[in-house]
Amino acid sequence: MSRFARLLLIVALFFTSAWAKTVKETLRITWEEGAPNGQARELIYTNGQFPSPTLVWDEDDDIEVTVYNEMAKNVTVHWHGLDQKDTPWSDGTPGLSQRPIQPGNKFVYRFKASPPGNHWYHSHEKMSLVDGLYGAIHIRPKGDRTGLWSQISQDKDDIKAMENAAYDPEYLVVSDWSQYTSEEYWKISTDSGLLVFCLDSILVNGKGEVYCPGQKFLQAELAPGLVEDAFPPGTEVSDKGCFPADLDQVQGGPWNITKRPDLIPPRVQEGCVASRHENATIVVDPSKNNGWVSMHFVAAATIAQITFSVDSHEFWLYEIDGNYVNPRKFVSAVMSAGETFSVMIKLDQEPGKYTMRIPNSGASQVLGGFAEMVYKGCEHEEKAGKAYLSYGGNPTSPDVEKNSFFPWQLDTDHMSPWPPNKPRPGNADEEHLLVLGRVGAPYNYTMNTKYLYPVDFQNDDPLLFYPNATRDTENDGLVLRTKNGSWVDLILQVSTLPGDTSSFEHFMHKHGSKTWRIGFGTGVWNYTSVEEAIQERPQDFNLETPGLRDTWITAFSIGGEAYWSVFRYFVDNPGPWLFHCHIELHLMGGMGIAILDGVDAWPEHIPEEYQC
């Protein structure tokens, strides 16, 4: 090797190692009392704070996170949106990639910081997301994003400014909050025989209040047509904005169980008690970055579907689920539990204090949430600006509705990947039909016709280490197996199971890989293949510019109309990956399935420290 070639090799190795630095983090998980909305309860703290610390890394960093469980209950940490390529043992899913971290023990997660973008981490043990273990992750990219920003502005100064703003964004972790712990909340449903999903607050960065604007006000804030289309005439919400718990349209059925609404404690469904506390304040500086600011939103909600807007400010949505998209300008956007959004805002309004409106937009409850975006130096000024959303998340004008992002279906969700990235056309190599819905009780949910995914499924013998443990057992109905290098279609059907003809949305998240949503339509799936469906209903498919994400929404079905969705992905990351609804009540009730991707190339060289 020549001296020059040797020098080039040394330089290349230097820059590779510079990019791939090792970053060590420590997370200490404790159980303490707190009052994020002004009302005390016990919750999870991470390193003494709630929500958990924001973690910022560079693409391809070698990450080592040591988690100390200092609670009296089990825990794991899932790195939501990270692909865990070649490190499935660090995904953080009990029963699939590890055993739960028991009280007093620790676990070391090791993985590459990949892919770049806006992600988050959270607990994955039972319903403990309700208790507060969640935080933002930002992986700064190595690649050039000029082509992304130039779709927003052709000005070179703007392009440079947006790159700087995206490198150092504001983080907004949005969560819903209940006065009850996860164990208490679930017990209310099982004791009463009713699925209960009434909340108390929307929090931003762990801060919020309990609002009690009155029953008449909340009734007037219902989404137009919701009661007429979905509920009996005259249905009224409570003074917390919640629908009556014993409505058949809410609970489904009939089920062979006893309904005991009298066992729902006071203040769960009604009996609102207001509390003044504080809302999050985001201070922005229009003198920096040519007046551009980037905001990373994490929907760490457990039930709610969040809408967000900033009074008088439009924004460019440029990233969803850690995937860059061709930017589009909106005044409000809806995001489902589990999703992450990144937006770019031009600070071109009169300096002042502007309300950020972040209500629950779903049909589950009328519930407002707020934060403040304050221009630097205007912290003590009165609020200014024009509202785009009402307290309950309704657009304040037809023009607002026209310029809002709704992820309901193919014809309204036009957020195509940047740079272009589309799946293989035609038939996939494998197709799996999954029928979603309730079985046996209002709180029992399945992803495969009848099988309920237990909260402790394979906890003692995780499938990464025992991939054949469920064969020849009934539990094999909770497992799908795919081959490495194959294209897979997951066909999800809702509103066809007995007793579940009216179905709320499900927020479906797949670990280990993102999926393209290539199809969405009404009716019962009765096609022999996806290719046949494409030929018969081409208007319901998009294989040229479909979105690419790790969390997708299914349809809100009213009055027995069935819906289906088709998601396509490529298998190149062998391991056991959970596919589940990100509504905590639904996952707790059984809405999950284990996908063993690449069983013919199963990981063999698992580090000894992870061996079970």
Curated annotation (Swiss-Prot):
The keyword Transit peptide does not apply. Gene3D superfamilies: Cupredoxins - blue copper proteins. Its EC number is 1.10.3.-. Binds 4 Cu cations per monomer. Cu cation 1 binds at H78, H509. Residues 1-20 form the signal peptide. It is an enzyme of class 1 (oxidoreductase). Its cofactor is Cu cation. This is Laccase 1. The lineage of its organism: Eukaryota, Fungi, Dikarya, Ascomycota, Pezizomycotina. The gene is Mlac1.
